Amino acid sequence: MTRDNSYSRYCIFLLLTTLFSLFFNTSYGYKERERAVESDTLIVSDAVRFLSKYVAIPSVSGQENEAAYWLAQQCDEKGLNIEYITNNLGSVNFAASLYPLSSGKPNIVFLNHMDVVFAGDEKLWKYPPFEGVMADERVWGRGSFDNKGLAVIQIFAVEQFVDLAAKEELPFNVTVLCVSGEETGGLTGSALVAKDFIERFNPMVVIGEGGSGMDELSFLEGTGPLFGISIAEKGCMLVKLSWTSDNAGHASIAGNYASLMMINGLYKLLNAPHPIIMTKEAELMFSSVGEKLGGIKGKVMSKPSSKLFMRFLKQHAQKNPELNEILTNKITLSGLESTKTSYNQVSQEEAAILDCRLLPGETPEGLVNFIKSALQDSLVQISIVEQGPLPLTTEPEYFFNLLAYALESEFDGASVVPMLLPASTDNSYFRALGIPVYGLNPMIVSPDQLKAIHSYDEFIKFVDVDRGIDVFVSFIKAALE
């Protein structure tokens, strides 16, 4: 997940639990695979062992080549058709498919990224970050959850249809698309793949990372886990604020210098409250949960634009970041730049880099106007230095229903709702092409698991991998029927 997504994914898990605690006070053939657990003896599945090896290959953004070539070779040995989209240093992107892409078949595309973020101080890890340690029924290491675990789930699910595809002419292709550079904005990965994606892949749907499951939420009265399938996400752009001053450079006589103007401006901007916005995506998410909940409380929630519910949201959103993420744009200070040359010399130019996340329907121009209004500074220069695709939405349709069916089949009593992902992923490059795109990590996750993403002690449970494979196998099988 890109940049600040680890925090945002944690917000996803906490969002509904916080919201409700405040509001309520409260028949084609395919290869069968053995379950990971038999009786009292734990059996480590082939998929888990595969993931352990994959995690042990470091693939920090820009250094994905070794991991990419290993993964492509493994997919080839499993009988998948390999096609490199790009094959350059720091930019390897390949497809592993049931049929060659040249077949032109309509295509179900599973998307994952091979790059990971830096591990940080390895001494702070419970286990080394690049050894793929299997312990406590978990695979530990950088990328085990984000995003190598999902890749293994996708590959092992699609592999189970290789023999069938060789015997019969299936009505569609299934592809696992493995890309580079997601953690740094996708410019070496999905941005390149998307250029001729429709012509080369003939996609019916793209399924990438996104929502996941939360277990036994009290407001659903113990009926089972709640899964969110993301249908939209926030857009991303980097904004640069620059201040210049021609005051004397010596620190002992400086007046209203650039550093002071920057500090005062950033204080005002970063403490300015963003307006609460009920997007149609958030409205659909809240109303879907309300329908699942039922009763008087569910009826209130099923109308999230009502004065009663909006009053509640405005009262609590500012105090609860996990709720605020869904309902507001976000500006985060991500870096500072200075022309300062010595400690007794005042810099005449200072700059701040802002990581900005936009709700669907919001525009870069609108956010720039918000920045100007908050700063009230005629001397600041504002420029957009990087901008991803504008946030678009996939309306839930046939493939959403199949994913929901697969989750409900695997997890007893599960409820599935569409959701807005308060983060940015590579999914946005493909939504921008007008293709149905959904985000799903097909597993139940815990707060400690999500908090470890992009941090220390990242892990994925063995059972997450095995059950996730079953979900996607069920999805593909249902599509064939």
Q: What are the residue ranges of the model-derived segments?
A:
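Bacterial N-terminal signal peptides
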Residues: 13-22
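Bacterial N-terminal signal peptides that target proteins for export
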Residues: 2-13
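A short core secondary-structure module
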Residues: 191-196, 249-275
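Acidic/histidine-rich catalytic neighborhood of metal-dependent amide-processing enzymes
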Residues: 138, 145-228, 323
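Short, solvent-exposed loop/turn segments at the edges of secondary structure
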Residues: 91, 127, 171, 201-202, ...
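An extended, acidic, His-containing surface patch that forms the Zn2+-binding/catalytic region
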Residues: 103-105, 214-216, 224, 275-340, ...
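Acidic/His- and Gly-rich active-site-bordering loop/insert found
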Residues: 30-142, 148, 163-172, 354
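Bacterial Sec-dependent signal peptides at the C-terminal "C-region" and cleavage site
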Residues: 21-38, 214
